[in-house]
């Protein structure tokens, strides 16, 4: 119940913001998270000193993630993943017709890129680049109506194959063979094997069950820190079972794209799927599916984008003809007479 309540508050907050501010909600949300991240950066400096903080940050950026000291404090998981969503939006979908819109777009894009990079979630950076490229390739193309829901259906099939590979250690062996440091994820995933089965009759253990068994493993000394699975696809399957997992993924990956395609247009559907696709990469290796701000941003950006695209045209105000227009009109009438 707590998870449902938590997620409901995030989604309802996004709806309320869009209801109050319409298309301005994205800009206000961006400003607020930039201010929040800046405040965290400034408040963390006294603990390390200015020179050491700058050196730590530069080292993290140059080495692509060797975070220590001050830079480690800036690895603000929820906010960093949200900045990835905002980078995707401003790079591909933000309005850029007028000069003012172009300036605003570039200003926010640079800010979001900066905060996204200093958060240094290495799995998220290539994911953002991938879906920026996909968005740029598809945003002006007319595709069949069945394509985006079909992509969502393929994602669900991929998740089931992914779970099979996780359970049988295929993912772990593959990544270890190419030298990828899984940072203990493979061990956590193997510990979970006795608690679920890949079967259509598996009904799950209920919400928060994974947190319970993680606590038990920690108390038993099996793990050093009570971290979740770092695999939200596995977590949802263990807790909700096969039917619940199909419901959870079907709503997000099939029904929601169908809704946006019917209510709005293909470009809105593409925005939602690009944002969701980026977040899906993090679902596979992290605990982001139920982060408060990530959940809010995923809904808020698409909702506010719809408000921008569905704005009624500005009413035309009658203006009298100019002196030159009147002369031209009289000349035409005289020629016709």
Locations of regions flagged by a protein language model:
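Transmembrane alpha-helices of multi-pass inner-membrane enzymes
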Residues: 88-90, 273-283, 287-337
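Long extracytoplasmic/lumenal interhelical loops at the membrane interface
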Residues: 176-240
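A membrane-periplasm/extracellular boundary helix in multi-pass inner-membrane enzymes
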Residues: 42-51, 118, 136-178, 194-198
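Structural signal for the C-terminal ends of transmembrane alpha-helices
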Residues: 15-25, 89-99, 133-142, 166, ...
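Hydrophobic transmembrane alpha-helices and their immediate junctions
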Residues: 145-147, 239-280, 303, 309, ...
């Amino acid at each position: 119940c707590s998870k449902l309540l938590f997620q409901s508050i995030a989604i309802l907050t996004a709806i309320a913001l869009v209801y109050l501010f319409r298309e301005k909600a994205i800009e206000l949300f961006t400003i607020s998270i930039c201010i929040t991240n800046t405040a965290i950066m400034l408040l963390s400096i006294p603990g390390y000193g200015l020179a050491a903080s700058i050196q730590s940050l530069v080292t993290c950026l140059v080495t692509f993630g060797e975070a220590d000291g001050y830079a480690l404090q800036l690895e603000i998981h929820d906010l960093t993943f949200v900045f990835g969503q905002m980078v995707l939006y401003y790079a591909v979908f933000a309005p850029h017709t007028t000069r003012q819109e172009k300036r605003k777009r570039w200003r926010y894009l640079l800010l979001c890129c900066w905060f996204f990079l200093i958060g240094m979630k290495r799995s998220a950076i290539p994911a953002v680049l991938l879906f920026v490229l996909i968005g740029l390739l598809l945003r002006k193309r007319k595709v069949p109506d069945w394509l985006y829901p079909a992509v969502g259906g393929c994602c669900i099939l991929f998740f089931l194959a992914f779970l099979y590979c996780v359970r049988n250690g295929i993912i772990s062996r593959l990544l270890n063979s190419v030298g990828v440091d899984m940072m203990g994820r493979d061990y956590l995933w193997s510990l979970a094997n006795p608690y679920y089965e890949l079967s259509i009759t598996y009904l799950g253990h209920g919400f928060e069950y994974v947190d319970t068994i993680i606590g038990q493993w920690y108390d038993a000394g099996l793990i050093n820190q009570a971290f979740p699975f770092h695999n939200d696809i596995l977590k949802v399957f263990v807790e909700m079972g096969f039917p619940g997992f199909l419901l959870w993924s079907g709503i997000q990956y099939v029904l929601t794209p169908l809704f946006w395609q019917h209510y709005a247009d293909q470009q809105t559907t593409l925005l939602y799927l690009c944002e969701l696709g980026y977040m899906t990469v993090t679902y596979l290796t992290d605990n982001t599916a139920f982060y408060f701000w990530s959940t809010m941003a995923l809904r808020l950006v698409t909702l506010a984008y719809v408000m921008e695209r569905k704005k009624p045209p500005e009413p035309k105000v009658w203006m009298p003809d100019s002196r030159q227009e009147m002369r031209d009109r009289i000349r035409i009438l005289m020629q016709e007479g």
